[in-house]
Amino acid sequence: FNLPNERNREITVDQIHKKQECMIKAAALMKDSGFAGVDLHAAHWGYLLDNFLMPIANHREDEYGGCLENRVRVITEMVEGIHQVCGSDFAVTIGLGVKSFITALNKGSLTGENEAGRTVEEAIEIAKLLEKAGVNAILADVGIYDSFYHACPPGYMPKGHALDLYAQVKEQVGIPVL
C-alpha cells in the first residue's frame, strides 16, 4: 500500500518515546525468555527508524532531525536503554543499509549514481555513532523498497554485488559487520 502523493504526519516526540519504551520492553522480554541479544530492524529498507536517518524523509526541526547525530538519536537512545535494562552483556545488533540506491523518493537506481538516500560515506558515520552507543554488530544491507532489486537481488545480478560497500564500513568500525 503506497500513496506516493500523500505524506504521513510527523510522529510526535511522545510517540517516539513510546516506541522506544516498547522496543526496550520487548528486549527485556527476550532476555527474560533466555535470548542472548536482540536485532533491531532499525536502519534499512525505508522503515520508520530508517526514515529518521535519511534527510530525504526526515524534515524534523527538533532533537530528532537536522544533523546526523540528531537523526541517529532515536536509535542510539533505544540501544542505550536496552543496555541499561538488559545489561551490557545483552547483545544488540542493527541492520544498516549502507546505500539506498534511489535518485528520489519512489525512484530506484540500478547504478547508484546521483544517490538521494544514504551514501556509504554517511553509513560509515552512522555506524560509528551506533558503535559508540553500544551496538555490538551491524548487519549490512543495501537498497530500500524503492530499489528492491538491490535489497533482494535477482539471479542476473552478480553475487556479492555490494560486498565492497560493506567492506568500506567494516574498515571504519571496531565491531563486526555481517
Identify the role of each PLM range.
Residues 1-178:
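Flavin-dependent oxidoreductase catalytic cores
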